[in-house]
Amino acid sequence: MPKTILVVEDDADMRALINHHLLGAGYIVRAVSNGLEAAASCLAVTPDLIVSDVHMPRMNGFEMIAILKSEPAMERIPVIFLTADAKGRRRGNKLGAVEYLTKPLKVDALLEAVAKHLPVEDARA
């Protein structure tokens, strides 16, 4: 069964780009534009992995992950952070991020990071 990835990105063009490539790799993608929407989405359906921007309106990626990781069902979900500012890497790692990719986003790096934590074979099974 295909794995589900939650994409949290406030920039619509970036969100569409990520969705396009993840769908093409065989994943199910749910996309939202901020941390509040992500928290609500995770209550409805627990994703297998989260790809999240750090700097977003309403609730940033760090705040969102801190809240989500406090839930037992979410504590082991891998998180890949995306940001234009690499200074928050240590904070992201403390919150349980498994990868920290900088913008401008290299699609190949994102797909490699996702496949590392959700192998493509599993996504297409």
Spans of model-derived segments:
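Conserved acidic carboxylate
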Residues: 9, 83
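Alpha4 helix (beta4-alpha4-beta5 surface) of REC/receiver domains from two-component response regulators
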Residues: 16, 63, 85-102, 111-112, ...
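Charged docking surfaces used in two-component/phosphorelay signaling
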Residues: 16-24
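Short hydrophobic/Thr-rich beta-strand motif most characteristic of the beta2 strand and flanking loop
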Residues: 26-33, 41
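Acidic catalytic/metal-coordinating carboxylates
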Residues: 34-37, 60-66
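Active-site beta3 strand of CheY-like receiver
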Residues: 45-51
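Receiver (REC) domain active-site loop signature in two-component systems and cognate sites
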Residues: 56
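Receiver (REC) domain switch/active-site region of two-component response regulators
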Residues: 106
